[in-house]
Swiss-Prot record:
GO CC terms: mitochondrial inner membrane; respiratory chain complex II (succinate dehydrogenase)
Involved pathway(s): Carbohydrate metabolism; tricarboxylic acid cycle
Function comment: Membrane-anchoring subunit of succinate dehydrogenase (SDH) that is involved in complex II of the mitochondrial electron transport chain and is responsible for transferring electrons from succinate to ubiquinone (coenzyme Q). SDH also oxidizes malate to the non-canonical enol form of oxaloacetate, enol-oxaloacetate. Enol-oxaloacetate, which is a potent inhibitor of the succinate dehydrogenase activity, is further isomerized into keto-oxaloacetate.
Annotated positions binding heme b: H127
Regions crossing the membrane: 63-92, 113-137, 145-166
Tissues in which the protein is found: Detected in heart muscle (at protein level).
Biological source species: Sus scrofa (Pig)
UniProt-recorded name of the protein: Succinate dehydrogenase cytochrome b560 subunit, mitochondrial
Subunit structure: Component of complex II composed of four subunits: the flavoprotein (FP) SDHA, iron-sulfur protein (IP) SDHB, and a cytochrome b560 composed of SDHC and SDHD.
Residues annotated as transit peptide in the record: 1-29
Protein family: Belongs to the cytochrome b560 family.
Bilayer topology: Multi-pass membrane protein
Side Mitochondrial intermembrane, residues: 93-112, 167-169
InterPro entries: SQR/QFR_C/D, Succ_DH_cyt_bsu_CS, Succ_DH_cytb556, SuccDH_FuR_B_TM-su
């Protein structure tokens, strides 16, 4: 069997060496090479002054898109905040009461305290309500574009109302 295969390959190589045109059965000339295609592509795009890839400026921002980005951002910020709070409680001298007394001794006005509490509670409430919205999506509900926008508005209203209420406590 090996001898037959060797004989066939040997004949093929001999034919290719003596007369290469007989060994190529369906010789089709290439239209263009990859290099020519690439040069034509770059010449066309550079001449038209368009960006290399879809750029952020061509997208129309929608409420669900912005809320998705904000949900990720609040998740990162809340994780970092909890981690920093835990590390500061572990490493700073004193206890909670001494830190609370320090804040009270600063004599900050009620407006500044309310604003600080609102700033702390707003990302938490947004992430919570938007997380509930994502859980509803996991059930397969509210996935049409109008429902996405409506649920986004509801999340924003609930976020503001609950943040105002919690900051007032």
């Amino acid at each position: 069997m090996a001898a037959l295969l060797l004989r066939h390959v040997g004949r093929h190589c001999l034919r290719a060496h003596l007369s290469p045109q007989l060994c190529i059965r369906n010789a089709v000339p290439l239209g263009t090479t990859a290099k020519e295609e690439m040069e034509r592509f770059w010449n066309k795009n550079l001449g038209s002054n368009r960006p290399l890839s879809p750029h952020i400026t061509i997208y129309r921002w929608s409420l669900p898109m912005a809320m998705s980005i904000c949900h990720r951002g609040t998740g990162i910020a809340l994780s970092a905040g909890v981690s920093l709070f835990g590390l500061s409680a572990l490493l700073l001298p004193g206890n909670f009461e001494s830190h609370l007394e320090l804040v009270k001794s600063l004599c900050l006005g009620p407006t500044l305290i309310y604003t600080a509490k609102f700033g702390i509670v707003f990302p938490l409430m947004y992430h919570t309500w938007n997380g509930i919205r994502h859980l509803i999506w996991d059930l397969g509900k509210g996935l049409t574009i109008p429902q996405l926008t409506q649920s986004g508005v509801v999340v924003l209203i609930l976020t503001v109302l609950s943040s105002v209420g919690l900051a007032a406590m």
